[in-house]
Amino acid sequence: MATTVHLSSFSLFIQSRGRRDNSISSVKSLKKRTGLSPSSALTSQGGRDMIPPQGKSNDHNSAFDFKLYMIRKAESVNAALDVSIVPLREPLTVQEAVRYSLLAGGKRVRPLLCIAVCELVGGDEATAMSAACAVEMIHTSSLIHDDLPCMDNADLRRGKPTNHKVFGEDMAVLAGDALLALAFEHMTVVSSGLVASERMIRAVVELARAIGTKGLVAGQVVDLSSERLNPHDVGLERLEFIHLHKTAALLEAAAVIGAIMGGGTEEEIEKLRKYARCIGLLFQVVDDILDVTKSTEELGKTAGKDVMAGKLTYPRLIGLERSREVAEKLSREAEEQLLGFESDKAAPLVALASYISCRND
């Protein structure tokens, strides 16, 4: 009989800071739209169970090392990305611009998520790798475009000058476009023969939907139109829309695609969709917190950029302490979606939620 995940064996008690505020009602709208209730942390009482930062269980029987797992998966993804890009040829500049951003490192959270989910439902790394690389290509494309002067006007990304600072705005736009096209080409060509055609079509549709006007693009549009708005005139519903679409949508797609490629059941796919939606929002809440609590050197990108741009963020809307409470609750709700899966196979995903909530960059 399969062993199920026990949250208590991956828990660490963290005392919530400050007093709980029971006056925020608009946060509850998220549960209606997503089937989740991450913001219910705003009305919670007492301490919360959290996972240790390195993803290691407090249970002496568990030897899972998430840090090592993450390093190994990142190495596999980096190697696959390196060979996925065609050899340099004319026009050289755009090829160099593509490689500059795609191979700049990073935590590779999205491809790791795709692979871990595929393995959880019975697949393997080889089956998921092309899709995982496609997700990272699209993520990198979105970062290149997001950093442009007409968008966020950022100078640093992953500790290096942004693409347009090195290659110019025109070449950065084209590099982002090229990565977007390469993602779908790579995913479909490399996976041919590994995955049934109907599953591949479903995965492609899932990914396309996540980055179009029903996903990432929609989030970016609302994000840009919300700059300089008075936070007192904007509810949490607008902020949650931005983050559900701009950040969570691609993480959700990474998980769902991994489940599809691995042959997951409909029930498994939906549970993992909810899990990814939780960690997607969690990722952005933590990102908002880090933007106002860490330095540029620590983040590898310009700290305080969102504040300077007048963007809507969780700390700006509900304060730093309540933002931490929301992050804490999201991590717990993500873990809850993994109940019923084999504990050994689910361990990377349990630890990933912890890693995102505890990350410092």
Swiss-Prot record:
Taxonomic source organism: Arabidopsis thaliana
InterPro entries reported for this sequence: Isoprenoid_synthase_dom_sf (IPR008949), Polyprenyl_synt (IPR000092), Polyprenyl_synt_CS (IPR033749), Prenyl_diphosphate_synthase (IPR053378)
Any one GO molecular function term: geranylgeranyl diphosphate synthase activity
Positions with a binding annotation for Mg(2+) 1: 146, 152
Similarity-based family: Belongs to the FPP/GGPP synthase family.
Annotated cofactor note: Binds 2 Mg(2+) ions per subunit.
Catalytic reactions on record: isopentenyl diphosphate + dimethylallyl diphosphate = (2E)-geranyl diphosphate + diphosphate; isopentenyl diphosphate + (2E)-geranyl diphosphate = (2E,6E)-farnesyl diphosphate + diphosphate; isopentenyl diphosphate + (2E,6E)-farnesyl diphosphate = (2E,6E,10E)-geranylgeranyl diphosphate + diphosphate
Alphabetic keyword roster: Carotenoid biosynthesis, Chloroplast, Isoprene biosynthesis, Magnesium, Metal-binding, Plastid, Transferase, Transit peptide
Residue range covered by the transit peptide: 1-39
Source organism phylogeny: Eukaryota, Viridiplantae, Streptophyta, Embryophyta, Tracheophyta
Protein name, UniProt field: Putative geranylgeranyl pyrophosphate synthase 8, chloroplastic
Gene Ontology CC terms, in alphabetical order: chloroplast
Gene3D superfamilies: Farnesyl Diphosphate Synthase (1.10.600.10)
Subunit record text: Monomer.
Annotated residues for binding of Mg(2+) 2: 146, 152
Keyword hit for Repressor: no
Annotated positions binding isopentenyl diphosphate: 107, 110, 139, 158
Entry superkingdom: Eukaryota
Annotated region described as Disordered, given as residue ranges: 24-58
Main location: plastid
Bias kind Polar residues: ranges: 36-46
EC number(s) reported in the record: 2.5.1.-, 2.5.1.1, 2.5.1.29, 2.5.1.10
Primary role: Catalyzes the trans-addition of the three molecules of IPP onto DMAPP to form geranylgeranyl pyrophosphate.
